[in-house]
């Protein structure tokens, strides 16, 4: 089935209203896209974050009466009769197959590979984590995840106890287990993330060495390795919580940090952590070290 895609640029103040109008006029799906490639930071619980310049995208059936729809949209105060838009056809494709074709096994460091389940692993003797894009949040494609995975690949994980703070999809937890960790505890504020982590662990055959908890439910422990790939705001707010998970001489790795935020993170953690030189990938950074 062919589709028409309508793109409208607006501000964050009006983006949801524009999206509601598209839905009311027959859009089968509405998405919000950053119009100017602006970094987005961690929202507060219950808060919906939109970019200052937001592009609202509506998907319409090919036979939709777009002339009438555009006329109705132009009567809305938040748009006005001279609003700017882009209307373009989307050719009929096997979108699922095209989506799958875009993902390939990725290598991090010397040993570690992240592989979609529908692909053959390039090296059966390597450390292979099977993880499908779309099941949850991190799949190795974002620089913050890649920075942590490359760090993990260089660590002797044999017999280690690990905390993955803000585990998301569980990609870092799974990598640690596949690299030889004895036990990993995943912590996240989102129950869906915990469910995704458990499911991904089951798919990789390591569920018996993984426990997951909401922050308020996690038992006290001191781990050999603590990983926190979240964002700088929570890293600063939760500095004492994160460092307390780490035993003396244990290892800590932090990411989700913009390069310009490194000094602030290092200042917050330097009292408790002997810091290594930070690593940079594009606009993102990794901070790591060992507990005093």
UniProtKB/Swiss-Prot annotation:
It is an enzyme of class 2 (transferase). Pfam families: PrmA. Gene3D superfamilies: Vaccinia Virus protein VP39. The keyword Methyltransferase applies. Keywords: Cytoplasm, Methyltransferase, S-adenosyl-L-methionine, Transferase. Its main location: cytoplasm. S-adenosyl-L-methionine binds at residues 145, 166, 188, 229. It is found in: Cytoplasm. InterPro entries: Ribosomal_L11_MeTrfase_PrmA, Ribosomal_PrmA_MeTrfase, SAM-dependent_MTases_sf. GO terms for cellular component: cytosol. Methylates ribosomal protein L11. NCBIfam families: prmA. Belongs to the methyltransferase superfamily. PrmA family. PANTHER family: ELECTRON TRANSFER FLAVOPROTEIN BETA SUBUNIT LYSINE METHYLTRANSFERASE. This is Ribosomal protein L11 methyltransferase. It comes from Alteromonas mediterranea (strain DSM 17117 / CIP 110805 / LMG 28347 / Deep ecotype). The gene is prmA.
């Amino acid at each position: 089935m062919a589709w028409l895609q309508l793109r409208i640029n607006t501000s964050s103040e009006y983006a949801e209203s524009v999206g509601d109008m598209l839905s009311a006029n027959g859009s089968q799906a509405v998405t919000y896209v950053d119009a100017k490639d602006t970094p987005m930071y961690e929202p507060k619980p219950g808060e919906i974050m939109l970019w200052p310049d937001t592009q609202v995208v509506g998907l319409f059936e090919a036979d939709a009466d777009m002339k009438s729809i555009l006329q109705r949209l132009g009567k809305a105060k938040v748009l006005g009769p001279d609003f700017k838009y882009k209307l373009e056809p989307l050719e009929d494709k096997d979108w699922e197959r095209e989506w799958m074709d875009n993902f390939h096994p990725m290598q991090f460091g010397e040993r570690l590979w992240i592989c979609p389940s529908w692909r053959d692993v390039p090296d059966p003797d390597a450390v292979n984590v099977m993880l499908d894009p779309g099941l949850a949040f991190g799949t190795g494609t974002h620089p913050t995840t890649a920075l942590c995975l490359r760090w993990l690949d260089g660590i002797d994980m044999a017999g280690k106890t690990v905390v993955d703070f803000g585990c998301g999809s569980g990609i870092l937890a799974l990598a640690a287990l596949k690299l030889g960790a004895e036990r990993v505890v995943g912590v996240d504020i989102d129950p869906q993330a915990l469910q995704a982590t458990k499911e991904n662990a089951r798919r990789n055959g390591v569920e018996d060495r993984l426990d997951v908890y909401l922050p308020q439910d996690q038992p006290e422990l001191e781990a050999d390795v603590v990983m926190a790939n979240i964002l700088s705001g929570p890293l600063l707010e939760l500095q004492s919580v994160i460092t307390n998970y780490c035993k003396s001489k244990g290892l800590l790795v932090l990411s989700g940090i913009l390069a310009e935020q490194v000094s602030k993170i290092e200042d917050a953690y330097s009292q408790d952590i002997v810091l290594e030189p930070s690593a940079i990938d594009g606009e993102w950074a990794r901070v790591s070290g060992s507990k005093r």
